[in-house]
């Protein structure tokens, strides 16, 4: 069972499981089923926030991949974030325990950890965020992990995966990063800020998550990172592939704050999530740049592919979808 099956991670996870000969059931409240086209999966509409509906959905399930989450850096969504990411996780854990699921793989995030000290490598033993005033999404992932660990003590066999930033193909909706990627490719963003982030290819993440079913230890968390990629280099690779110059100007960091009103208006007019917010700037500005992911590499065989391959395949996917000119 995959919760949030039509999302970016869920879409790639479905394909990886099918490739491994595993029967897949997906639950999703969203009726956007493009992620399932031509896939042999069992679709069950529902929501992790509807505790009662999970009884029939979990019937006969052996393994659960809990990917369903609200990924938003807009504080106006904090109640929804809490409902889905925290209480939804509690419902999934309760249903998993009740239906005697063999294994739960819970998808958390590197953002669940306390960021400080920034200069130290981010490892699995880093304390989780406790500050109630923290970014709502970050705090929700930390609290959800605490719930998973609580259920492990009750007998649930669960392992936790902390991806860094996620990118790659089969991003149908698309994700926040996917929309940014498309906007850059279409020339809708003319300037660059010299920052970056650690990104893992979603296909590598899916492979590692499947391996975690058999190799992941109960209650253990695994950081699944990729490569640090700054947006200047990303735009260079994209420019070369598309044959046109992208992100022509590099601006100082403070200009991001100047752009906040524009992105707010844009999100309201176009009725899509706001990509640039105070919290997203905070995430970029105060990040852990050293994320070795050694435990996942050693125990789960995680092997990140190159930045160039990921960008090329992501471009091809969006071009095939008709969203890049």
Please provide the spans of the model-predicted regions.
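NAD(P)-dependent short-chain dehydrogenase/reductase
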Residues: 154-160, 164-198
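Active-site Tyr-X1-5-Lys
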Residues: 133-159
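Substrate-positioning beta->alpha
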Residues: 91, 143, 174-176, 193-213, ...
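A hydrophobic C-terminal alpha-helical subdomain
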Residues: 189-193, 199-204, 253-299
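Mid/C-terminal beta-alpha module of Rossmann-like enzyme folds, strongest
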Residues: 208-275, 293, 306-325
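N-terminal Rossmann NAD(P)H-binding glycine-rich loop of SDR-like oxidoreductase domains
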Residues: 1-20
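NAD(P)H-binding glycine-rich loop region in Rossmannoid oxidoreductase-like domains
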Residues: 41-87, 95
């Amino acid at each position: 069972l995959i919760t949030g099956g039509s999302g970016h991670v869920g879409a790639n996870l479905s394909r990886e499981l099918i490739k491994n000969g595993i029967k897949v059931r997906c639950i999703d409240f969203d009726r956007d089923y493009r992620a399932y086209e031509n896939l042999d999966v069992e679709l069950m509409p529902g929501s992790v926030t509807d505790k009662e509906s999970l009884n029939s959905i979990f019937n006969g399930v052996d393994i659960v991949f809990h990917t369903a989450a609200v990924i938003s850096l807009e504080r106006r969504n904090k109640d929804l974030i809490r409902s889905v990411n925290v209480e939804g996780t509690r419902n999934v854990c309760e249903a998993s325990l009740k239906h005697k699921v063999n294994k739960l793989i819970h998808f958390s995030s590197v953002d669940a950890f306390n960021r400080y000290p920034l200069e130290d490598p981010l490892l699995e033993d880093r304390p989780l965020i406790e500050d109630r005033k923290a970014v709502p999404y970050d705090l929700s992932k930390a609290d959800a992990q605490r719930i998973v660990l609580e259920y492990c003590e009750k007998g649930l066999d669960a392992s936790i995966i902390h991806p860094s930033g996620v990118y790659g193909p089969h991003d149908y909706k698309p994700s926040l990063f996917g929309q940014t990627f498309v906007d850059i490719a279409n020339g809708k963003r003319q300037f660059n800020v010299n920052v970056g982030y650690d990104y893992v290819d979603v296909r590598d993440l899916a492979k590692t998550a499947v391996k975690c079913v058999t190799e992941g230890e109960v209650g253990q968390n695994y950081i699944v990172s990729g490569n640090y990629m700054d947006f200047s280099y990303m735009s260079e690779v994209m420019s070369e592939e598309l044959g046109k110059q992208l992100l022509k100007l590099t601006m100082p960091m403070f200009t991001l704050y100047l752009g906040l009103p524009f992105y707010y208006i844009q999100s309201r007019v176009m009725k899509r999530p706001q990509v640039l917010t105070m919290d997203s700037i905070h995430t970029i500005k105060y990040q852990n740049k050293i994320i070795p992911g050694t435990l996942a590499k050693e125990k789960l065989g995680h092997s990140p592919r190159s930045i160039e391959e990921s960008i090329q395949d992501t471009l091809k996917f969006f071009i095939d979808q008709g969203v890049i000119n």
